[in-house]
Each structure stands twice: as C-alpha cells, then as structure tokens.
C-alpha cells in the first residue's frame, strides 16, 4: 500500500519544458500537483453538476460520490490509469422517465445500483475473457445507435426547460458556443461552465433566480444520503445504459493509451469493474451513476501532466465542495432557462457521439441491414415509443436497444444462412 502512494518527482517538480510530459507514476511538487487537480475539478464540474440538476438528485451528494468513485477507481487500478469519474449523462433519460412516472429518486437509485452491478460484472468478464466479445455483440452500427438514442431521446425535455425562459436559454446557448470558438486551451474547454455562469448572471438580472434556499443552508455539513427503493419494473429503462458505459469506458482507456503512449488494454476490465463498483455505491447512497470523463483528457492534453496524483487531489477538492451545503444550494438555484439553453447543445452532442462512432468506424450505410436497423432505432427513440408488459415499462431507449440488438443479429444470421449476406463481408460484422 505504501508503494501505491509513492510517485517519483519529475525533474525539479516545478517546471516543464515544451513537449515534456509527467507520467502517471510521477508528480510535480504537491502545490503544483494540487493546481493541476483543481483544473481537473473545474473541467469536469460543468458536466457533473448538470446531471443532478436535470434529474432532481442532490448536487452535493452526487459530487461526494464522484470523489469516492474516483478514489476507488485509482485504488483498484493501482494508480496506473489516470481518470476522473464524473456524473454520466447516460442516466438522465431513465432517471427522468422514472421521476416523470412519480416513482421518485429512491426508485431511480435502485436502477443506478443495478446498472453498476451489471457493469462491474462485465468488467470481471472482460478481465478474464478479454473484450473481443463486446465487439461481437456491439459492432459499430449497433454501438453508435445505442449511444445516439441516449441523447436524442431527451430532445422533448430540452424544450420543456427552454420555453420557460427562451431569452435566458438563448443567451446561455450563445455564450457556450462563443466561448468554444473564440478561446483555445482550458478556457475553450470550459465553454459549458462559463456559458452557464453567463446565463445565470443574465437570469439574475431578469429576476429569474430564487436565492431563498441559500441563506438557510449551512456552510459545513454532510450531503443528503438515502437508500434505494427496490422496483424491478424500471430496470428495462436502465439496462441500456450499461452498454453506453461500456462504450464510454473502453473509449476512454483507448484515448488515454493513445495520449500517453502506453498500452492500457489490460486495464479495460479493471476500468469497467471500478466504474461499476463506483456507480453501485453511488446508487446505494443516493448519488448519480458515474463514468470516466473526456473533459479531463482535455486537461491532460493541455498540461502534459498524466500524474494520477493530480486525480487524487481532484477527488479531494470535490469531496470538500460536497461537504458545503451552501455550495449545493447555490447550484440548485440554476433556473430552467439556463438548463434549457445548455442542454440544447449537450443532449445533441451526446447523440452526435453515436454518429461519430459510425463515422470513425466507417460504417457502410450502403448495406441495407446497417441503414435499416439504425433508422428504425433512431425513430423509436426520437419518437419516444413506450409500452408496458406485465407491469414493466419500456421507454424509447429500452425498446430501441432491444430492437437493434435483435434485428441486427437476427437479420444478419438469416442473411448469412440464405446466402444474401456474404459471410466474409467486412461491412457486416
């Protein structure tokens, strides 16, 4: 254990020459390392606090569990893989569906807990059996569609917030876009956070912010924890999120490998297990589910500091913020107009991540099988198809996921059996 928390000081610990990098098992001086850790908190914060705000979860509780999950992640991978675990946007749709049905946060927490357990189980399987079977079950056309529908299914909820205060929503959205295109480096990557701050300031001027809860909140205190309430009927809404979390974690590991020049393929199973365990714990205590964050890859790309020590500092800062109820109360005052503006971009970007999976993997939509199963899945999600069977509810995401998995593999098997699909066709995996 003592070796686990021993990092070699890089150079003089203070300065870095152009192009020089700090490896995961190295660190700068602790003040410099803490500075990098603070940058990681700022980078992840814009996305992390939006998830509880949009779903009705407590921001302080969610932040607390992101800190715990990050620490757990680093412990499990023995400080080899630098990552921060923030709130996953994949949970917004199923949580919203549950709360809209008046089943409450406790029931949604059960869905998060089970999702985490399933992800941890997949992590164990990948660790011992490899990740090839994931590619077989979820080829790019399937993987991309599932990720895309998580975002596009949320489009109606964006409008519900947007129409409350269209002027504030537009100001927020324009601010996010301008920061993204006018600034480079860390500031440009903080476009969501800065845009929300600008939109919030505008909302304050317009008298759209209720500050009453801030004065009643204490400066120091524990977050609000609550136990999950068992309800198996909501699980079909959450199970598809497991596939999204698998895709996010695998993509994250490969991105870090490419950036650091290290082969982290042997860490994929560990990453999935650690994120699954963190999500399970969060669900047990009333926090939102977690995932590895691309925002923090941006910080590493900008600073060239890959030290896992910086992520321990980030987890520490996040923990301290979660223990300030007044801070959580401030976050809860963000008005609907601001949320409508920022989610217009965010939910669309989640959907476009799925499209990017298609593009990067050169999915051939000249093949009828590929384009038909993708088209059906997208319409099911965007149209928000829904039905119930024996008391179990299926929303657009659950139905779309089932349809594309069954349709793709079923039709592929029929096509290959009848000879209409070449068994060696590289475009039909």
Feature-to-residue mapping (PLM):
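Short, non-helical or kinked segments that cap or interrupt transmembrane helices
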Residues: 57-63, 79-92, 133-143, 188-194, ...
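N-terminal signal-anchor module of multipass membrane proteins
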Residues: 1-83, 89-102
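Hydrophobic, membrane-embedded alpha-helices of multi-pass small-molecule transporters
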Residues: 32-46, 168-172, 190-191, 206, ...
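Membrane-embedded helical hairpins/re-entrant loop segments and their flanking transmembrane helices
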Residues: 18-34, 51-74, 239-308, 426-429
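Juxtamembrane interface elements at the cytosolic ends of transmembrane helices
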Residues: 12, 17, 45-46, 174-179, ...
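Membrane-embedded alpha-helical modules
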Residues: 102-212, 320-422
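Intrinsically disordered, low-complexity non-transmembrane regions of multi-pass membrane transporters
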Residues: 1-35, 211-224, 258-261, 271, ...
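Interfacial segments of multi-pass membrane proteins
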Residues: 95-101, 180, 296-311, 317-322
């Amino acid at each position: 254990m003592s070796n686990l928390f021993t990092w070699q000081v890089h150079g003089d610990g203070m300065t870095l020459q152009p192009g020089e990098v700090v490896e995961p098992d190295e660190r700068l001086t602790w003040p410099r390392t803490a500075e990098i850790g603070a940058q990681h908190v700022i980078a992840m914060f814009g996305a992390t606090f939006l998830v509880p705000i949009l779903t009705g979860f407590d921001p302080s509780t969610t932040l607390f569990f992101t800190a715990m999950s990050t620490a757990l992640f680093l412990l499990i991978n023995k400080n080899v893989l630098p990552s921060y675990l923030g709130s996953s946007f994949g949970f917004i749709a199923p949580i919203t569906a549950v709360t809209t049905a008046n089943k409450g946060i406790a029931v949604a927490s059960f869905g998060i807990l089970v999702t985490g357990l399933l992800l941890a189980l997949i992590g164990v399987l990948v660790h011992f059996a490899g990740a090839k079977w994931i590619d077989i079950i979820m080829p790019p056309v399937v993987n991309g569609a599932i990720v895309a529908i998580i975002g596009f299914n949320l489009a109606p909820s964006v409008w519900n917030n947007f129409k409350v205060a269209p002027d504030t929503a537009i100001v927020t959205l324009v601010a996010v876009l301008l920061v993204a295109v006018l600034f480079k480096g860390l500031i440009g990557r903080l476009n969501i956070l800065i845009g929300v701050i600008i939109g919030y300031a505008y909302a304050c001027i317009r008298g759209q912010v209720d500050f009453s809860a801030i004065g009643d909140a204490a400066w120091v205190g524990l977050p609000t924890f609550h136990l999950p309430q068992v309800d198996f009927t909501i699980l079909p809404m959450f199970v598809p999120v497991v596939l999204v979390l698998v895709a996010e974690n695998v993509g994250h590991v490969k991105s870090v490998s490419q950036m650091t020049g290290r082969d982290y393929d042997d860490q994929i199973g560990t990453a999935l297990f650690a994120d699954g365990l963190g999500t399970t714990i969060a669900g047990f205590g009333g926090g939102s589910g977690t995932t590895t964050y691309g925002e923090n890859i941006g910080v590493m790309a900008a600073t060239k500091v890959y030290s896992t020590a910086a992520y321990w500092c980030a987890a520490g800062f996040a923990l301290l913020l979660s223990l300030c109820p007044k801070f959580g109360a401030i976050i809860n005052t963000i008005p609907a107009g601001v949320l409508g503006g920022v989610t217009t971009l965010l939910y669309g970007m989640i959907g476009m991540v799925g499209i990017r999976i298609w593009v990067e993997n050169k999915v051939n939509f000249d093949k009828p099988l590929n384009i038909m199963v993708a088209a059906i899945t997208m319409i099911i999600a965007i149209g928000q198809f829904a039905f119930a069977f024996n008391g179990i509810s299926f929303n657009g995401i659950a139905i779309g996921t089932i349809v594309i998995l069954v349709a793709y593999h079923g039709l592929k098997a029929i096509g290959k059996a009848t000879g209409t699909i070449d068994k060696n066709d590289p475009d039909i995996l």
